[in-house]
Curated annotation (Swiss-Prot):
Pfam families: 7tm_1 (PF00001). Disulfide bonds join 122-198. Belongs to the G-protein coupled receptor 1 family. Residues 1-53, 110-123, 190-213, 277-295 are extracellular. The lineage of its organism: Eukaryota, Metazoa, Chordata, Craniata, Vertebrata. GO terms for molecular function: G protein-coupled receptor activity. This is G-protein coupled receptor 182. The modification Phosphoserine is found at residue 329. One of its GO terms (cellular component) is plasma membrane. InterPro entries: G10D_rcpt (IPR001350), GPCR_Rhodpsn (IPR000276), GPCR_Rhodpsn_7TM (IPR017452), GPER1-like (IPR047143). It is a multi-pass membrane protein. Expressed in liver and lung. Orphan receptor.
Amino acid sequence: MSVIPSPRPVSTLEPDNDFRDIHNWTELLHLFNQTFTDCHIEFNENTKHVVLFVFYLAIFVVGLVENVLVICVNCRRSGRVGMLNLYILNMAIADLGIILSLPVWMLEVMLEYTWLWGSFSCRFIHYFYLVNMYSSIFFLTCLSIDRYVTLTNTSPSWQRHQHRIRRAVCAGVWVLSAIIPLPEVVHIQLLDGSEPMCLFLAPFETYSAWALAVALSATILGFLLPFLLIAVFNILTACRLRRQRQTESRRHCLLMWAYIVVFAICWLPYQVTMLLLTLHGTHIFLHCHLVNLLYFFYEIIDCFSMLHCVANPILYNFLSPSFRGRLLSLVVRYLPKEQARAAGGRASSSSSTQHSIIITKEGSLPLQRISTPTPSETFRRPLRLQTPHLHSAIL
C-alpha cells in the first residue's frame, strides 16, 4: 500500500541474479538502513503488530457490513432520485474493494511483512487497492460538485442530460483511477529470499526521482486537488442552503462541514508522513529520531487512513432518514410475517414524518413534502417541480 520502502533491516535477504541486474544491492541495503545507523530508538514492534491487526480487523468487519448494506439499498433505487445516488453507490463499491483487500494486509502484518502469495499477487493486490482508493476519493469529489450543481442549475439542458452526464463521469472516474496507479505498480516487486517482501523498488539510479514522482502525484491527485474541490463546493452548498432559511438548514450546513473535516482527518496525516519520508535524504533532512518515529508509525497512519471506508457510509447514507427507512423496508422483506408487520408499521410511521428537500424556482424557499398526507391536506400538497431535488444527496 505504500511507495515508501520499509526501513527494517533486510540484510538476511539474498536477491536473485535478475534483481541484481537492476539494483546495486549493497547501496540499496544502505538506503533502507541508513536511518538506523545514526541513532537507533527501541520500539515495541510486537505491540504495533497487535494494534495494527486489531485496527485492520475492526475496519474490515464494520466497513464490510456498512458498505454491503449501502450497495444493497441503493441498488434497489431507481429514477431521478436514484441517479443522484449514483456517486454514492460507486463510492461504496470502491470502499468495499478496499475492505476486501484488508485480510491480505492483516496477514502480512502478522507475518512481519513476509509476502507468501507470489509475484503476481504482489502487484495485483496493490493495484487493486490503489484503483479503489483513487475511485473512492474521486467519487466523493464528484458528489460534492454534483450536489452544488443540482442545487443551483435549473437549466432545461441539465435536466435532460444529467443522467447521461453522471453515468459518463462515473465511467471516466473508474478509467482514470485505473491509469493513475500504473507508474507505481510497475515498480512494485517481490524481493525473493528467505523472507520474501513486496516493495516499491525502482532502479537504484533513478529510485529517488521515481519515489518523489509517485509520492507527489499521490499527494496532488489523491489529496490536495480533491480536498480543494470538496471544501469549496461543500462550503458553497452550505452557504446556499443557509440563505434559503429552511428548517433543517443548520443540520445540512453542519453535515457539509463534517464532510470536509472527516476527509482531512482521514487523509492529511498519511499524505504528510508519506511526503516527508520520500523527501528525506534527497530534498530535506529530518532529525534521525523523527525519521525513526515516522517510519515506526507509518503503517499505523496508513491503516488510520482507511477509516474513510467506515466514515463514508455513515456520513452519506446512515444519517439520511430516507436511507434508514429504505434499509428498514429491505430488512422487513426477509423477516417472518409477524415481525414484518410490526417493523413495517414502524417504517411507515418513520417515513410519514421524514422530509425531503424540493428545489423550487430561484429565490423561493424550498417546500416540504410529507410522504403520506391526510385527505384534508391533499389539496395543499405542493406540486413536484421538474427541477432536481437534493433528497439524500445532502442527507
